[in-house]
């Protein structure tokens, strides 16, 4: 068996905010300026917050003024408060005539009810968990409800940025915008061990490659933003300023198709990158026909019911299924994924003719008794090139390798613009990721203050092929700065492959010695 490992260093390819792939201006498509409180939450249980996800979907539907009504029914108990959510969508006729774009001025009771009913219907379809901070916690159930109850396109898919290079991600996002479709987007603001997730809408693109964001807060903070920053407030991630730059995901093809009715009751979604022979970095091998190799996957159950799943790798030629080469069986609860990846041994038939083939995940269940392609949240198609009794097997790039991060220049101290809220000191780090590998893990600052060493750790993403400026705020509560002198500061990132920190220098990480960077006190 011959193995080939990928080389992902792309030292000359960077995609900062002003270099979006195939950038083409798209004017902001939404004219709505909704939020989560009155009148938007008037129909929610006990006047709970409307929820950022329902507000985002309601704004998208208002652009299209479709559907006329919802479809089917939903019944569930919501969150810790155990609110009963029971909605007969057929009885919800959306009053598009009376749904205003902006409720910050005067409005009638009828106009208030129209938007409140729309947003509550969106929340019920998304299986929102209602409370003072309403959230949508399961994307598979959310997608199921959006399609079955609001007739969002059958091609709608939930994609996670971590599984794609920046170039791939931007091209997919731009394709949606050019087609005239706003994109349901989510991100997290990570600060002081808090993970504040938020759903919003990206609905435009400017000439500099920045994306117009409708954050769903009465229009407050709406702006064109760098996709690597997504700052609602402040300018740079890493501190008190709200930037939804982490854990990015989007729903593509998120638009209503009222005429479509044939949505599946159960499918599987590929949750993670495909791993070859249990080796994260292995991209390609050559095997004999009939020789076993291992493909690892994880699946999520797109259904409202527990399902008994049969799943396996199908062999395709020119888009047609030839055979299911291997399969396994597991039970999986509604909306849930496997706790651990599943490892399936695969062997290509010894009689296979020369040519190009694909290995594709298929599944069936007691709810959906027909073998169907698994939906992809991450790339899943495995290439198989057969020639003279041998096969080259290539899995998609999983973007999990070493990002080889380094700094564009020395660390400098900048003003803490949030001193009033979080006393401390702020340091500017200009990260460069020259690879196709995405990073989201620990960044450690080691600070020498009057001879005493301190460490401060923050978790942040540095996406592939990008240059991103971080303003990392180190709180006074973490490091005793007051009245003291900073002697030196150095930074490192946690490398999961080595299970250790890699020092960050101002040259590419092939450098043997990474100097300590000094800052002014």
Predicted regions and their residues:
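Bacterial Sec-dependent N-terminal signal peptides
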Residues: 1-25, 128-131, 146
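Active-site-adjacent structural segments surrounding the nucleophilic cysteine of cysteine proteases
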Residues: 22-135, 139
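Active-site-adjacent substructure of cysteine-protease-like catalytic cores
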Residues: 144, 148-214, 221-222
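Short, compositionally biased P/S/T/A/G/V-rich stretches that sit at domain boundaries
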Residues: 235-304, 318-321, 381-422, 511-521
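A short beta-turn/strand-edge loop motif at beta-sheet boundaries
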Residues: 286, 301-309, 352, 434-442
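Aromatic sugar-binding surface patches on proteins
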Residues: 333-346, 463-476
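Short glycine/proline/serine/threonine-rich loop/turn segments at secondary-structure transition edges
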Residues: 350-360, 478-488
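Short acidic/polar inter-strand loop motif in beta-rich domains
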Residues: 365-374, 494-503
